[in-house]
Amino acid sequence: MIFIPIIILIYLVSIAASDKSPKIKKNPRNVVAVADFPFGGDTQVKGNVVFSAKEGKHVNVHIDMTGLPKDEGPFFYHIHERSVPGNGNCEAVGLHFNPYNASPVCDEQKNDAYCQVGDLSGKHGCINTTCFELKYSDPYLSLNRKSKSYIIGKSVVFHYPNLTKIACADIEEANELRLQSLIDEYTQTDDAIQLKELNTPLETDYKFDEVEALSSEIYHSDTDSDPPQQELISTEKLYNKTDNVYSPEETRPSDQNKKSHRHSLLPLAKWKKNSPKNYSNISIHGISSDCLNDGMMVTGSVFGSLVLGIAAGIFV
């Protein structure tokens, strides 16, 4: 059959064609973004994803979710390129946020710089429980609206392994009322880390220079043995030329041609990175021991996963 060699060829080409994202060294300290669930899709999925950078450096991500379907994981989650329409249709959010045209096969890349900016589960691990809380920093996300990696106005989407969307929500800048409600949540749960992240006062004269910060978006060397490199990228290349607004559904491009995400069915073990994570059973919105995933099945063969992933990803 010709089909399988073609699959292998597409897989290899996608890996070779990966483009590299810069690390974001400066972010506004006075911006907090949040995706609140439920919004679109399954209304039983509740919680939030909070993005902040109170130190002015990398974006810190705090995920606290509950209500994902039992016995259906592992679950994948990504930032998608468009916001959720008013009718809550998760199919209208477009493809993964991928401003540097990276390969969808994050697991096979040299490092996370070659992954899609929005592929959060590819960079940080998929979820294998129905309720979870975790914290990590992602140096490839930006809260600077001039950056190509700017995430506000886009959406967070949770997927089944076959890429069917479960739930989605807009990433919005938190106003003072929403920020205070987050602080109240973390106060009730004694989450000192998040309280420090959100409740640290700024200097009265604090200002963030959006254009100047672009000069701090740099490529790093791929190997630890190489001397440090700080290759500055031209402002023109980094400047975010999209409007990042919630455009009416009828003005959005068609989403009929969906990209294949072949990594979605790779074995769960392949996704467990060595980087530390703050997985725990306690969640603000639930306790994961009350809703464990029993008997979760994951494809065990990379080649089998590749065939299934292409069949599920290209033609769905």
UniProtKB/Swiss-Prot annotation:
GO cellular component terms attached to this protein's record: extracellular region; extracellular vesicle; side of membrane
GO terms, biological process: removal of superoxide radicals
Cleavable signal peptide: 1-18
Protein keywords: Antioxidant, Cell wall, Copper, Glycoprotein, GPI-anchor, Lipoprotein, Membrane, Metal-binding, Oxidoreductase, Secreted, Signal, Virulence, Zinc
Glycosylated position list: N128, N162, N240, N278, N281
Enzyme type, top EC level: oxidoreductase
Modification after translation: The GPI-anchor is attached to the protein in the endoplasmic reticulum and serves to target the protein to the cell surface. There, the glucosamine-inositol phospholipid moiety is cleaved off and the GPI-modified mannoprotein is covalently attached via its lipidless GPI glycan remnant to the 1,6-beta-glucan of the outer cell wall layer.
Family to which the UniProt record says this protein belongs: Belongs to the Cu-Zn superoxide dismutase family.
Full protein name: Cell surface superoxide dismutase [Cu-Zn] 6
Native source organism of the sequence: Candida albicans (strain SC5314 / ATCC MYA-2876) (Yeast)
UniProt lineage: Eukaryota, Fungi, Dikarya, Ascomycota, Saccharomycotina
Protein encoded by which gene: SOD6
